Amino acid sequence: MDTLPLDGRASVLLAGVDEVGRGPLAGAVVAAAVILDPDRPIAGLRDSKRLSAARRSELDRRIRAQALAVSLGRAEVAEIDRLNILQASMLAMQRAVAGLDPAPVQALVDGNRAPALPCPAQAIVKGDDRVPAIAAASILAKQARDAEMRALAEQYPGYGFERHMGYPTTEHLQALRTLGACPAHRRSFAPVRRCLLG
């Protein structure tokens, strides 16, 4: 993994920030913020989408055990529908960073846009492949959101949330047509809105 050069205090209290769940039709957007310990590097950190479930689970445990600070933030379905998915994602990331203790001196955020934060923040395209702290955040966020979607699958059976995690797969779209929308669905997303309009 290429790492971006940092120096001084920022390298110690640098938060990596990422979110998961912008594209799904159901469930919250979950963000994570992580401050890694530079004296305890964690091998194998990379974009969560490129890791097996078993490897993500193992790294999730190691990150939580070795990081200086970790925090999760979320934006609920009602907030996504009220704000829009971009603003809800920014809100989830702000909440994740606000939960860090100690507070970061700098934040590096995956993507092309960073939320307004109480510390300097820089957006980094493909940051989850370039910055270990962002990769760590992507792993924690994905693990947390996947667990939430498995719980929603038990609460709302028949949609297959445990398999597609709310993304608009053929299975999910068919279930929407057959069962209609459940409270976990994002009403502002076109496929759900079409279903509600009949």
Swiss-Prot record:
The note describing how and how many cofactors are bound reads:
Manganese or magnesium. Binds 1 divalent metal ion per monomer in the absence of substrate. May bind a second metal ion after substrate binding.
Q: What is its EC number?
A: 3.1.26.4
Question: Which InterPro entries would you find in this protein's record?
Answer: RNase_HII (IPR022898), RNase_HII/HIII (IPR001352), RNase_HII/HIII_dom (IPR024567), RNaseH-like_sf (IPR012337), RNaseH_sf (IPR036397)
Top-level taxon: Bacteria
CDD domains tied to this protein:
RNase_HII_bacteria_HII_like (cd07182)
Required co-factor?
Answer: Mn(2+); Mg(2+)
Metal-binding keyword on record:
yes
* SUPFAM superfamilies, A to Z: Ribonuclease H-like (SSF53098)
Provide the binding site for a divalent metal cation. 18-19, 110
One GO biological-process annotation of the entry reads: DNA replication, removal of RNA primer
What does the UniProt function comment say about this protein?
Answer: Endonuclease that specifically degrades the RNA of RNA-DNA hybrids.
User: What's this protein's family per the entry?
Assistant: Belongs to the RNase HII family.
Name of this chain's protein: Ribonuclease HII
- Organism this protein belongs to: Alkalilimnicola ehrlichii (strain ATCC BAA-1101 / DSM 17681 / MLHE-1)
In the UniProt record, the gene name given for this protein reads rnhB
